[in-house]
C-alpha cells in the first residue's frame, strides 16, 4: 500500500473528563507499513483517577506521579503530526474529543489534521455483531497486545485500518471519506 501514511492514535483517561489523559499511544504507518509505535504515561491535571477508569486500563496515580503532563507529551506527538497530519482512531469521536479538550485546558494551538475513524469504517464495511477494537482484531486474526493500553491499542487500530483500506477497494486513503473529519 504505497503512499498510505497515517498515525493511529489512542488515549486512556484517568476520569470521565476527556482532558484527563493518563496515557497516549501512537503508531506511525509509512507506505502502508508500521514504522514505529510509541506510548507515554501522562500525568493528568491533579493526578486524580476514578475507580472505574483504573479498572479499565489498570493505570494508577503512582504510575503517573512523575510522568510528563499533556503539553510535554503533545510537543512530541506534534513532531510526528508535522511529518504526517493524518490521524486514525477507533471511535475517533472519543480520541479527537480528548485532544480538543486537552488542547483547550492547556491553552495549546489546534493543529491542522485530518482524521479517520476505524470504527465508522468497520460499520460501513462489515456486518459484525460487535465492532469493538479487540473483537474486530480477533475476527481478522490481528494479534492483540494489552487491550486498553494506548500504545497497543494504537497499533491494533493501525493494523485494522490497513485491513479496512484493503477491504474497501480504495487505493487512496482520501477515498475513505465515509469515515473522516478535521480536527
Language model features with spans:
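Conserved beta-strand -> loop -> alpha-helix junction used to position metal-binding or nucleic-acid-contacting
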Residues: 109-122
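Short Asp/Glu-rich motifs
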Residues: 73, 156-157
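Buried hydrophobic packing segments
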Residues: 99, 121, 157-161
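Conserved non-catalytic scaffold segment of RNase H-like nuclease domains
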Residues: 1-112, 127-130, 134-148
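Acidic two-metal-ion nuclease catalytic site recognized across multiple nuclease folds
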Residues: 1-2, 158-183
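Conserved catalytic/binding loops enriched for acidic/polar residues
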Residues: 153
Amino acid at each position: 500500500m504505497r503512499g498510505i501514511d497515517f498515525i493511529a492514535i489512542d488515549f486512556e483517561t484517568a476520569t470521565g473528563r476527556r482532558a484527563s489523559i493518563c496515557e497516549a499511544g501512537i503508531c506511525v504507518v509509512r507506505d502502508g507499513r508500521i514504522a514505529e509505535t510509541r506510548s507515554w504515561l501522562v500525568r493528568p491535571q491533579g493526578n486524580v483517577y476514578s475507580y472505574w477508569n483504573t479498572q479499565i486500563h489498570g493505570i494508577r496515580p503512582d504510575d503517573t506521579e512523575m510522568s510528563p503532563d499533556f503539553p510535554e507529551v503533545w510537543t512530541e506527538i506534534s513532531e510526528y503530526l508535522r511529518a504526517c497530519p493524518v490521524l486514525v482512531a477507533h471511535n475517533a469521536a472519543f480520541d479527537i474529543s480528548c485532544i480538543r479538550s486537552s488542547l483547550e485546558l492547556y491553552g495549546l494551538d489546534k493543529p491542522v489534521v485530518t482524521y479517520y475513524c476505524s470504527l465508522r469504517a468497520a460499520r460501513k464495511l462489515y456486518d459484525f455483531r460487535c465492532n469493538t477494537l479487540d473483537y474486530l482484531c480477533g475476527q481478522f486474526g490481528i494479534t492483540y497486545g494489552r487491550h486498553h493500553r494506548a500504545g497497543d491499542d494504537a497499533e491494533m487500530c493501525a493494523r485494522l485500518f490497513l485491513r479496512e483500506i484493503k477491504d474497501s477497494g480504495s487505493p487512496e486513503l482520501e477515498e475513505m471519506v465515509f469515515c473522516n473529519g478535521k480536527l
